[in-house]
Protein backbone atom coordinates (compact mmCIF):
# COMPACT_ATOMS: atom_id res chain seq x y z
CA UNK A 1 0.00 0.00 0.00
CA UNK A 2 2.76 2.45 0.94
CA UNK A 3 2.65 5.09 3.64
CA UNK A 4 -0.43 7.31 3.90
CA UNK A 5 -0.45 10.28 6.30
CA UNK A 6 -3.06 12.80 7.37
CA UNK A 7 -1.83 16.04 5.82
CA UNK A 8 -3.05 19.01 7.86
CA UNK A 9 -2.76 21.32 4.85
CA UNK A 10 -4.75 19.00 2.55
CA UNK A 11 -7.17 18.12 5.40
CA UNK A 12 -7.22 14.48 4.34
CA UNK A 13 -5.06 11.40 4.17
CA UNK A 14 -2.61 11.49 1.28
CA UNK A 15 0.14 9.18 0.00
CA UNK A 16 3.53 10.19 1.36
CA UNK A 17 5.71 10.50 -1.72
CA UNK A 18 9.12 12.16 -1.23
CA UNK A 19 10.13 14.81 -3.75
CA UNK A 20 13.45 13.05 -4.38
CA UNK A 21 13.16 9.25 -4.72
CA UNK A 22 14.95 7.46 -1.92
CA UNK A 23 15.47 10.60 0.17
CA UNK A 24 13.25 12.21 2.82
CA UNK A 25 13.64 15.60 4.48
CA UNK A 26 11.74 16.16 7.75
CA UNK A 27 11.63 19.21 10.01
CA UNK A 28 10.10 18.93 13.48
CA UNK A 29 9.72 21.94 15.78
CA UNK A 30 11.78 21.22 18.87
CA UNK A 31 11.54 22.49 22.45
CA UNK A 32 11.97 25.94 23.91
CA UNK A 33 14.64 25.13 26.47
CA UNK A 34 13.77 27.10 29.59
CA UNK A 35 12.65 24.26 31.90
CA UNK A 36 12.83 20.50 32.29
CA UNK A 37 10.62 18.63 29.80
CA UNK A 38 7.28 17.16 30.82
CA UNK A 39 5.49 14.14 29.37
CA UNK A 40 3.78 16.25 26.72
CA UNK A 41 7.20 17.11 25.27
CA UNK A 42 7.89 13.41 24.68
CA UNK A 43 4.86 12.63 22.54
CA UNK A 44 5.95 14.35 19.34
CA UNK A 45 9.53 13.07 19.41
CA UNK A 46 8.33 9.48 19.98
CA UNK A 47 5.68 9.69 17.22
CA UNK A 48 8.02 11.18 14.61
CA UNK A 49 10.75 8.78 15.71
CA UNK A 50 8.46 5.91 14.68
CA UNK A 51 7.91 7.61 11.33
CA UNK A 52 11.65 8.03 10.86
CA UNK A 53 12.34 4.42 11.85
CA UNK A 54 9.70 3.17 9.40
CA UNK A 55 11.26 5.19 6.57
CA UNK A 56 14.73 3.89 7.44
CA UNK A 57 13.32 0.35 7.46
CA UNK A 58 11.99 0.98 3.95
CA UNK A 59 15.45 1.97 2.78
CA UNK A 60 15.08 5.76 2.65
CA UNK A 61 17.91 8.11 3.51
CA UNK A 62 16.34 10.46 6.04
CA UNK A 63 17.57 13.90 7.01
CA UNK A 64 15.73 14.62 10.24
CA UNK A 65 16.06 18.20 11.49
CA UNK A 66 14.66 19.24 14.88
CA UNK A 67 15.59 22.63 16.29
CA UNK A 68 16.33 24.01 19.71
CA UNK A 69 14.58 27.33 20.43
CA UNK A 70 16.96 29.21 22.68
CA UNK A 71 15.87 32.78 21.89
CA UNK A 72 12.83 34.73 20.74
CA UNK A 73 9.97 32.66 22.22
CA UNK A 74 8.03 35.23 24.24
CA UNK A 75 5.85 34.50 27.25
CA UNK A 76 2.55 35.06 25.43
CA UNK A 77 3.66 33.26 22.23
CA UNK A 78 2.94 36.42 20.25
CA UNK A 79 4.85 39.70 20.01
CA UNK A 80 4.52 40.88 23.60
CA UNK A 81 5.91 39.78 26.92
CA UNK A 82 9.35 38.60 27.98
CA UNK A 83 11.63 36.05 26.35
CA UNK A 84 10.99 32.77 28.20
CA UNK A 85 14.67 31.93 28.53
CA UNK A 86 15.59 35.42 29.74
CA UNK A 87 12.83 35.21 32.33
CA UNK A 88 14.13 31.86 33.60
CA UNK A 89 17.69 33.20 33.65
CA UNK A 90 16.62 35.98 36.00
CA UNK A 91 14.86 33.50 38.28
CA UNK A 92 17.85 31.14 38.42
CA UNK A 93 20.44 33.95 38.41
CA UNK A 94 22.18 32.50 35.39
CA UNK A 95 23.17 33.77 31.98
CA UNK A 96 20.47 33.00 29.36
CA UNK A 97 22.80 30.67 27.46
CA UNK A 98 23.55 28.78 30.67
CA UNK A 99 19.82 28.20 31.03
CA UNK A 100 19.52 27.12 27.40
CA UNK A 101 22.47 24.73 27.69
CA UNK A 102 21.21 23.24 30.94
CA UNK A 103 17.73 22.46 29.64
CA UNK A 104 18.88 21.44 26.17
CA UNK A 105 20.83 18.59 27.72
CA UNK A 106 17.98 17.81 30.07
CA UNK A 107 15.81 17.34 26.99
CA UNK A 108 18.41 15.29 25.08
CA UNK A 109 18.96 13.01 28.10
CA UNK A 110 15.22 12.33 28.32
CA UNK A 111 15.00 11.58 24.60
CA UNK A 112 17.93 9.17 24.85
CA UNK A 113 16.23 7.35 27.72
CA UNK A 114 13.11 7.00 25.55
CA UNK A 115 15.19 5.48 22.73
CA UNK A 116 14.48 8.41 20.40
CA UNK A 117 17.08 8.63 17.63
CA UNK A 118 19.12 11.83 17.72
CA UNK A 119 18.22 14.30 14.95
CA UNK A 120 20.49 14.38 11.92
CA UNK A 121 20.81 18.09 12.70
CA UNK A 122 19.64 19.89 15.85
CA UNK A 123 20.16 23.57 14.99
CA UNK A 124 19.97 26.20 17.70
CA UNK A 125 18.13 29.40 16.88
CA UNK A 126 20.87 31.56 18.40
CA UNK A 127 23.37 30.10 15.94
CA UNK A 128 21.36 31.15 12.89
CA UNK A 129 20.84 34.89 13.33
CA UNK A 130 22.51 35.71 9.95
CA UNK A 131 20.04 33.47 8.10
CA UNK A 132 17.11 35.12 9.87
CA UNK A 133 18.39 38.60 9.07
CA UNK A 134 18.85 37.64 5.42
CA UNK A 135 15.29 36.32 5.20
CA UNK A 136 13.94 39.44 6.92
CA UNK A 137 15.77 41.71 4.48
CA UNK A 138 14.38 39.68 1.58
CA UNK A 139 10.83 40.15 2.88
CA UNK A 140 11.41 43.89 3.28
CA UNK A 141 12.73 44.13 -0.27
CA UNK A 142 9.61 42.39 -1.58
CA UNK A 143 7.32 44.85 0.20
CA UNK A 144 5.68 42.26 2.45
CA UNK A 145 7.34 43.53 5.63
CA UNK A 146 7.97 46.95 7.18
CA UNK A 147 10.22 48.47 9.83
CA UNK A 148 8.97 50.52 12.76
CA UNK A 149 11.15 51.81 15.62
CA UNK A 150 13.81 49.16 15.08
CA UNK A 151 11.35 46.26 14.83
CA UNK A 152 10.34 44.57 11.58
CA UNK A 153 6.84 43.18 11.06
CA UNK A 154 5.34 40.89 8.43
CA UNK A 155 2.43 42.52 6.60
CA UNK A 156 -0.19 39.76 6.84
CA UNK A 157 -2.60 41.37 4.37
CA UNK A 158 0.12 41.04 1.70
CA UNK A 159 -0.27 37.26 1.82
CA UNK A 160 -3.86 36.39 0.79
CA UNK A 161 -3.38 32.71 1.61
CA UNK A 162 -2.71 33.41 5.30
CA UNK A 163 -4.87 30.94 7.21
CA UNK A 164 -4.75 28.12 4.67
CA UNK A 165 -3.12 25.69 7.11
CA UNK A 166 -5.36 26.38 10.11
CA UNK A 167 -8.53 27.17 8.15
CA UNK A 168 -8.78 30.57 9.83
CA UNK A 169 -9.97 33.57 7.81
CA UNK A 170 -8.42 37.02 8.07
CA UNK A 171 -11.78 38.67 8.77
CA UNK A 172 -12.46 36.33 11.68
CA UNK A 173 -8.96 36.81 13.07
CA UNK A 174 -9.26 40.58 12.95
CA UNK A 175 -12.63 40.47 14.66
CA UNK A 176 -11.10 38.53 17.54
CA UNK A 177 -7.82 40.45 17.71
CA UNK A 178 -6.91 42.39 20.82
CA UNK A 179 -7.50 46.13 20.73
CA UNK A 180 -4.40 47.02 22.73
CA UNK A 181 -1.89 46.24 19.97
CA UNK A 182 1.50 47.86 19.57
CA UNK A 183 1.22 51.31 17.99
CA UNK A 184 3.83 50.63 15.33
CA UNK A 185 1.86 47.76 13.80
CA UNK A 186 -0.16 48.54 10.67
CA UNK A 187 -2.53 45.69 11.46
CA UNK A 188 -3.20 43.76 14.70
CA UNK A 189 -2.46 40.51 12.82
CA UNK A 190 1.01 41.56 11.68
CA UNK A 191 3.74 39.62 13.48
CA UNK A 192 7.34 40.35 14.34
CA UNK A 193 10.22 39.15 12.20
CA UNK A 194 12.71 41.12 14.28
CA UNK A 195 12.20 42.82 17.64
CA UNK A 196 14.01 45.92 18.82
CA UNK A 197 15.72 45.17 22.13
CA UNK A 198 14.42 47.16 25.07
CA UNK A 199 17.01 48.71 27.40
CA UNK A 200 18.42 45.99 29.59
CA UNK A 201 17.34 43.14 27.31
CA UNK A 202 20.11 40.56 27.67
CA UNK A 203 19.92 38.56 24.43
CA UNK A 204 20.52 40.98 21.55
CA UNK A 205 22.26 41.05 18.19
CA UNK A 206 23.22 43.78 15.75
CA UNK A 207 20.98 44.29 12.72
CA UNK A 208 20.42 46.90 9.99
CA UNK A 209 17.60 48.27 12.19
CA UNK A 210 19.49 48.42 15.46
CA UNK A 211 20.14 45.88 18.19
CA UNK A 212 17.42 43.31 18.73
CA UNK A 213 16.50 39.65 18.49
CA UNK A 214 14.50 37.45 16.09
CA UNK A 215 10.80 36.76 16.21
CA UNK A 216 9.91 33.19 17.11
CA UNK A 217 8.27 32.29 13.79
CA UNK A 218 11.13 33.24 11.50
CA UNK A 219 13.56 30.96 13.30
CA UNK A 220 12.08 27.70 12.05
CA UNK A 221 11.51 29.05 8.54
CA UNK A 222 15.15 30.07 8.21
CA UNK A 223 16.57 26.87 9.68
CA UNK A 224 14.32 24.45 7.78
CA UNK A 225 15.10 26.12 4.45
CA UNK A 226 18.82 26.14 5.23
CA UNK A 227 19.11 22.45 6.04
CA UNK A 228 16.36 20.92 3.89
CA UNK A 229 15.99 23.34 0.99
CA UNK A 230 12.86 24.40 -0.84
CA UNK A 231 9.89 22.06 -1.08
CA UNK A 232 11.12 19.68 1.62
CA UNK A 233 8.93 16.68 2.33
CA UNK A 234 7.44 17.13 5.79
CA UNK A 235 7.06 19.73 8.52
CA UNK A 236 5.68 18.43 11.81
CA UNK A 237 4.91 19.58 15.33
CA UNK A 238 2.29 19.88 18.04
CA UNK A 239 -1.28 20.85 17.24
CA UNK A 240 -0.84 24.03 19.29
CA UNK A 241 1.82 25.17 16.80
CA UNK A 242 -0.54 24.93 13.84
CA UNK A 243 -1.63 28.51 14.52
CA UNK A 244 -0.03 30.94 14.66
CA UNK A 245 3.49 29.47 14.45
CA UNK A 246 3.20 27.20 11.42
CA UNK A 247 0.79 29.52 9.67
CA UNK A 248 3.34 32.31 10.00
CA UNK A 249 6.14 30.05 8.81
CA UNK A 250 4.26 29.35 5.58
CA UNK A 251 3.50 33.05 5.05
CA UNK A 252 7.14 34.07 5.54
CA UNK A 253 8.59 31.40 3.28
CA UNK A 254 6.11 31.73 0.43
CA UNK A 255 5.99 35.54 0.54
CA UNK A 256 9.78 35.44 0.23
CA UNK A 257 9.37 33.41 -2.95
CA UNK A 258 10.33 29.99 -1.58
CA UNK A 259 8.44 26.73 -1.92
CA UNK A 260 7.91 25.48 1.61
CA UNK A 261 6.95 22.12 3.15
CA UNK A 262 4.98 19.73 0.93
CA UNK A 263 3.23 17.93 3.81
CA UNK A 264 2.25 18.87 7.37
CA UNK A 265 1.62 16.59 10.36
CA UNK A 266 0.43 17.61 13.84
CA UNK A 267 0.23 15.52 16.99
CA UNK A 268 -2.36 16.19 19.69
CA UNK A 269 -1.93 17.14 23.35
CA UNK A 270 -1.16 15.00 26.38
CA UNK A 271 -3.81 15.84 28.97
CA UNK A 272 -3.64 15.71 32.76
CA UNK A 273 -7.00 15.85 34.52
CA UNK A 274 -8.61 16.93 31.27
CA UNK A 275 -6.29 19.89 30.67
CA UNK A 276 -3.29 20.21 28.37
CA UNK A 277 0.05 19.59 30.04
CA UNK A 278 1.93 22.88 29.97
CA UNK A 279 4.92 24.45 31.69
CA UNK A 280 3.16 27.81 31.75
CA UNK A 281 0.28 26.53 33.91
CA UNK A 282 2.16 23.99 36.01
CA UNK A 283 -0.30 21.27 34.96
CA UNK A 284 2.32 18.65 34.18
CA UNK A 285 4.23 15.54 35.13
CA UNK A 286 7.97 15.97 34.68
CA UNK A 287 9.51 13.51 32.28
CA UNK A 288 12.61 12.88 34.39
CA UNK A 289 10.45 11.95 37.40
CA UNK A 290 8.61 9.39 35.28
CA UNK A 291 11.81 8.01 33.76
CA UNK A 292 13.41 7.55 37.18
CA UNK A 293 10.41 5.71 38.63
CA UNK A 294 9.34 3.63 35.62
CA UNK A 295 10.89 1.64 32.79
CA UNK A 296 11.40 4.20 29.99
CA UNK A 297 10.31 1.71 27.33
CA UNK A 298 7.02 1.13 29.15
CA UNK A 299 6.52 4.90 29.04
CA UNK A 300 7.25 4.92 25.30
CA UNK A 301 4.78 2.05 24.90
CA UNK A 302 2.19 4.10 26.81
CA UNK A 303 2.63 7.04 24.43
CA UNK A 304 2.17 4.78 21.40
CA UNK A 305 -1.07 3.26 22.69
CA UNK A 306 -3.01 6.35 21.57
CA UNK A 307 -3.11 7.51 17.94
CA UNK A 308 -1.01 10.63 17.54
CA UNK A 309 -3.91 12.76 16.25
CA UNK A 310 -6.08 12.00 19.29
CA UNK A 311 -5.68 13.65 22.70
CA UNK A 312 -3.98 11.36 25.20
CA UNK A 313 -5.26 11.36 28.78
CA UNK A 314 -2.45 10.58 31.21
CA UNK A 315 -3.47 8.58 34.28
CA UNK A 316 -1.40 6.59 36.73
CA UNK A 317 -3.73 3.64 36.19
CA UNK A 318 -3.13 3.87 32.46
CA UNK A 319 0.62 3.90 32.98
CA UNK A 320 0.47 0.81 35.21
CA UNK A 321 -1.65 -0.96 32.59
CA UNK A 322 0.88 0.00 29.92
CA UNK A 323 3.70 -1.42 32.05
CA UNK A 324 1.89 -4.74 32.26
CA UNK A 325 1.19 -4.75 28.52
CA UNK A 326 4.78 -3.92 27.69
CA UNK A 327 5.93 -6.65 30.07
CA UNK A 328 3.87 -9.22 28.13
CA UNK A 329 5.52 -8.29 24.84
CA UNK A 330 9.00 -8.18 26.37
CA UNK A 331 8.44 -11.56 28.01
CA UNK A 332 7.40 -13.09 24.68
CA UNK A 333 10.44 -11.64 22.91
CA UNK A 334 12.79 -12.96 25.60
CA UNK A 335 11.18 -16.38 25.51
CA UNK A 336 11.63 -16.63 21.75
CA UNK A 337 15.32 -15.71 22.11
CA UNK A 338 15.83 -18.23 24.88
CA UNK A 339 14.08 -21.17 23.23
CA UNK A 340 15.81 -20.61 19.90
CA UNK A 341 19.13 -21.72 21.40
CA UNK A 342 17.93 -25.23 22.27
CA UNK A 343 15.19 -25.83 19.68
CA UNK A 344 15.59 -28.66 17.15
CA UNK A 345 16.41 -27.67 13.56
CA UNK A 346 13.70 -27.05 10.99
CA UNK A 347 10.63 -24.88 10.56
CA UNK A 348 7.18 -24.81 12.12
CA UNK A 349 4.59 -24.09 9.38
CA UNK A 350 1.92 -22.82 11.80
CA UNK A 351 4.37 -20.33 13.31
CA UNK A 352 5.50 -19.22 9.86
CA UNK A 353 1.89 -18.49 8.89
CA UNK A 354 1.30 -16.60 12.13
CA UNK A 355 4.40 -14.49 11.47
CA UNK A 356 3.19 -13.74 7.93
CA UNK A 357 -0.14 -12.53 9.33
CA UNK A 358 1.61 -10.44 11.99
CA UNK A 359 3.89 -8.68 9.53
CA UNK A 360 0.99 -7.92 7.19
CA UNK A 361 -1.29 -6.54 9.91
CA UNK A 362 1.51 -4.54 11.53
CA UNK A 363 2.68 -2.85 8.35
CA UNK A 364 -0.87 -2.07 7.25
CA UNK A 365 -1.40 -0.32 10.58
CA UNK A 366 1.80 1.74 10.44
CA UNK A 367 1.22 2.70 6.81
CA UNK A 368 -2.28 3.93 7.67
CA UNK A 369 -1.26 7.28 9.15
CA UNK A 370 1.05 5.77 11.78
CA UNK A 371 -1.67 3.83 13.58
CA UNK A 372 0.56 2.66 16.41
CA UNK A 373 -2.41 1.41 18.51
CA UNK A 374 -3.34 -0.98 15.69
CA UNK A 375 0.28 -1.99 15.24
CA UNK A 376 0.50 -2.88 18.94
CA UNK A 377 -2.82 -4.72 18.66
CA UNK A 378 -1.31 -6.84 15.89
CA UNK A 379 1.57 -7.81 18.19
CA UNK A 380 -0.79 -8.75 21.01
CA UNK A 381 -3.02 -10.74 18.65
CA UNK A 382 0.05 -12.78 17.72
CA UNK A 383 0.93 -13.73 21.31
CA UNK A 384 -1.66 -16.50 21.96
CA UNK A 385 -0.62 -18.35 18.81
CA UNK A 386 3.03 -17.88 19.69
CA UNK A 387 2.63 -19.26 23.22
CA UNK A 388 0.67 -22.23 21.88
CA UNK A 389 3.37 -23.10 19.34
CA UNK A 390 6.50 -22.30 21.38
CA UNK A 391 6.95 -25.68 23.12
CA UNK A 392 7.33 -27.52 19.79
CA UNK A 393 8.69 -24.68 17.65
CA UNK A 394 11.73 -25.38 15.47
CA UNK A 395 14.90 -23.30 15.41
CA UNK A 396 14.54 -21.68 11.99
CA UNK A 397 11.02 -20.45 12.74
CA UNK A 398 12.12 -19.18 16.15
CA UNK A 399 15.00 -17.33 14.51
CA UNK A 400 12.51 -15.70 12.17
CA UNK A 401 10.21 -14.85 15.10
CA UNK A 402 13.14 -13.18 16.85
CA UNK A 403 13.95 -11.20 13.69
CA UNK A 404 10.31 -10.12 13.32
CA UNK A 405 10.17 -9.00 16.96
CA UNK A 406 13.35 -7.02 16.39
CA UNK A 407 12.24 -5.43 13.11
CA UNK A 408 8.73 -4.48 14.20
CA UNK A 409 9.17 -3.97 17.94
CA UNK A 410 12.58 -2.32 17.99
CA UNK A 411 13.39 -1.33 14.42
CA UNK A 412 10.09 0.52 13.88
CA UNK A 413 8.42 1.03 17.27
CA UNK A 414 11.70 1.47 19.15
CA UNK A 415 10.51 -0.54 22.16
CA UNK A 416 13.19 -3.19 22.62
CA UNK A 417 16.74 -1.83 22.80
CA UNK A 418 19.29 -4.47 23.70
CA UNK A 419 19.40 -3.08 27.23
CA UNK A 420 15.92 -4.35 28.11
CA UNK A 421 16.57 -7.74 26.53
CA UNK A 422 19.73 -8.38 28.52
CA UNK A 423 19.25 -6.33 31.69
CA UNK A 424 18.79 -8.34 34.86
CA UNK A 425 18.01 -7.33 38.41
CA UNK A 426 19.74 -9.31 41.14
CA UNK A 427 20.76 -9.12 44.75
CA UNK A 428 19.34 -9.91 48.21
CA UNK A 429 16.28 -7.70 47.79
CA UNK A 430 15.16 -9.48 44.62
CA UNK A 431 15.81 -12.91 46.09
CA UNK A 432 13.97 -12.04 49.29
CA UNK A 433 10.90 -10.71 47.47
CA UNK A 434 10.68 -13.77 45.24
CA UNK A 435 11.11 -16.09 48.24
CA UNK A 436 8.27 -14.27 50.00
CA UNK A 437 5.97 -14.64 46.98
CA UNK A 438 6.82 -18.33 46.65
CA UNK A 439 6.05 -18.84 50.34
CA UNK A 440 2.64 -17.20 49.82
CA UNK A 441 2.12 -19.45 46.81
CA UNK A 442 2.92 -22.55 48.84
CA UNK A 443 0.45 -21.46 51.53
CA UNK A 444 -2.21 -21.06 48.85
CA UNK A 445 -1.48 -24.54 47.49
CA UNK A 446 -1.70 -26.11 50.93
CA UNK A 447 -5.08 -24.39 51.35
CA UNK A 448 -6.10 -25.74 47.91
CA UNK A 449 -6.49 -22.15 46.67
CA UNK A 450 -5.14 -23.07 43.25
CA UNK A 451 -6.49 -19.93 41.61
CA UNK A 452 -4.33 -17.75 43.85
CA UNK A 453 -1.37 -20.09 43.44
CA UNK A 454 -1.59 -19.94 39.65
CA UNK A 455 -2.02 -16.18 39.72
CA UNK A 456 1.23 -15.69 41.67
CA UNK A 457 3.07 -18.01 39.29
CA UNK A 458 1.75 -16.20 36.19
CA UNK A 459 2.50 -12.76 37.61
CA UNK A 460 6.07 -13.83 38.29
CA UNK A 461 6.31 -15.29 34.79
CA UNK A 462 5.13 -12.00 33.28
CA UNK A 463 8.01 -10.32 35.13
CA UNK A 464 10.52 -12.79 33.70
CA UNK A 465 10.72 -15.10 36.75
CA UNK A 466 10.18 -18.77 35.87
CA UNK A 467 8.89 -20.98 38.72
CA UNK A 468 9.47 -24.75 38.50
CA UNK A 469 7.85 -27.17 40.96
CA UNK A 470 10.20 -30.01 41.96
CA UNK A 471 10.18 -32.80 44.56
CA UNK A 472 12.38 -30.63 46.73
CA UNK A 473 9.99 -27.68 46.44
CA UNK A 474 9.63 -24.71 44.09
CA UNK A 475 12.68 -23.34 42.30
CA UNK A 476 12.95 -20.16 40.32
CA UNK A 477 15.19 -18.71 37.65
CA UNK A 478 15.30 -15.52 35.64
CA UNK A 479 14.17 -16.04 32.09
CA UNK A 480 17.01 -15.91 29.58
Swiss-Prot record:
It comes from the Bacteria. The keyword Lyase does not apply. Keywords: Aminoacyl-tRNA synthetase, ATP-binding, Cytoplasm, Ligase, Metal-binding, Nucleotide-binding, Protein biosynthesis, Zinc. ATP binds at residue 279. A motif ('HIGH' region) lies at residues 31-41. InterPro entries: Cys-tRNA-ligase, Cys-tRNA-synt_Ia_DALR, Cys-tRNA/MSH_ligase, CysS_C, Rossmann-like_a/b/a_fold, tRNA-synt_1_cat_dom, tRNAsynth_Ia_anticodon-bd. Disulfide bonds: none annotated. Its cofactor is Zn(2+). Binds 1 zinc ion per subunit. A motif ('KMSKS' region) lies at residues 276-280. It is an enzyme of class 6 (ligase). Its EC number is 6.1.1.16. It holds the Pfam family tRNA-synt_1e. One of its GO terms (molecular function) is cysteine-tRNA ligase activity. NCBIfam families: cysS. This is Cysteine--tRNA ligase. It comes from Thermus thermophilus (strain ATCC 27634 / DSM 579 / HB8).
Amino acid sequence: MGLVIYDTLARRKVPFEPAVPGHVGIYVCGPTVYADPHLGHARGPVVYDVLRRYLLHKGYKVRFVSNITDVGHLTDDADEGEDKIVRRAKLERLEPMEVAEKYTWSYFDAMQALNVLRPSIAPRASGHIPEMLELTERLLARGVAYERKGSVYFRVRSFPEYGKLSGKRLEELRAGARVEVREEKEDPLDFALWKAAEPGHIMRWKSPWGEGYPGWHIECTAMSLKYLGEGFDLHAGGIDLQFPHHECEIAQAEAAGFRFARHWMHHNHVLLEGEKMAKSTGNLVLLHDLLEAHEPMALRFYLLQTHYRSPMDFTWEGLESAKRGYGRLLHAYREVRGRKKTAPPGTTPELERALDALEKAFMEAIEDDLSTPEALAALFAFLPELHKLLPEAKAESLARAEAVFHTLGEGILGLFPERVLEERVSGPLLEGLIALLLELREEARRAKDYEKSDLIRERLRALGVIVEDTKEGPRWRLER
